[in-house]
Design a protein with these regions (language model features):
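Bacterial N-terminal signal peptides that target proteins for export
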Residues: 1-10
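Short, contiguous alpha-helical
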Residues: 44-48, 55, 65-108, 151-196
Length: 196
């Protein structure tokens, strides 16, 4: 009969003991999940990214292009930026039930809102205030409430879906503004070659 190496025996015993412990651990009841703000963290990270891009694009497009529109009946540069802010307030109201501050003049007539100014500085302030409103509202969001049903713009959906739709709306209209910028020979700042 051959003698087994003590090292081999020790390795096999260790593996066997490890498997036994792993099975025992797997049978233990799971610890209660810690309070999480995972959605909030993810959402705010995505919001920061799209906000920086939108504001940098608004900065890059010259004031004399803010009345430009690709064709009659389509939003102009200024109207599209204001529409972004309108959506920020509208989706936030839909998710939280809280109306935007009275002094912003938000209402149900988005065409009137979109056409309220073509002044670049005013539009930037409006955009920044709308992003601040979204961010402040998101800080109160709890993961446990995200499946709560709400009605937004006549549609029943979860609170989570409203926040996701807000991000979708931001990206849709950022893309619109990118097309407008490029049609006017403005390169989106984040697309410029590095170092020059």
């Amino acid at each position: 009969m051959k003698m087994r190496s003590p090292l081999l025996i020790a390795a096999v015993a260790t593996l066997g003991l490890g498997a036994f412990v792993a099975r025992a651990e797997a049978k233990k009841p799971a610890a209660p999940a810690a309070a999480s703000n995972g959605f909030q963290t993810d959402f705010l990270g995505l919001l920061d990214d799209v906000q920086k891009k939108i504001l940098s694009l608004e900065d890059a497009i010259p004031q004399d292009k803010f009345k430009w529109r690709p064709s009659p009946g389509v939003r102009s540069v200024s109207e599209a930026f204001l529409h972004i802010a309108y959506g920020n307030y509208g989706f936030t109201k839909g998710a939280t039930g809280k109306a935007p501050p009275a002094d912003v003049g938000w209402g149900t007539d988005h065409a009137k809102w979109d056409a309220k100014t073509t002044d670049k500085a005013e539009i930037k302030k409006t955009l920044e205030a709308s992003f601040d409103q979204v961010r402040a509202a998101m800080k109160d969001v709890q993961d446990a409430d995200l499946d709560k049903k709400v009605n937004v713009f006549g549609h029943d959906m979860t609170e989570r879906a409203v926040w996701m739709a807000l991000l979708g709306h931001l990206n849709e209209h950022m893309g619109q503004e990118v097309a407008y910028a490029r049609a006017n020979n403005v390169v989106p700042p984040w697309s410029m070659p590095k170092g020059g």
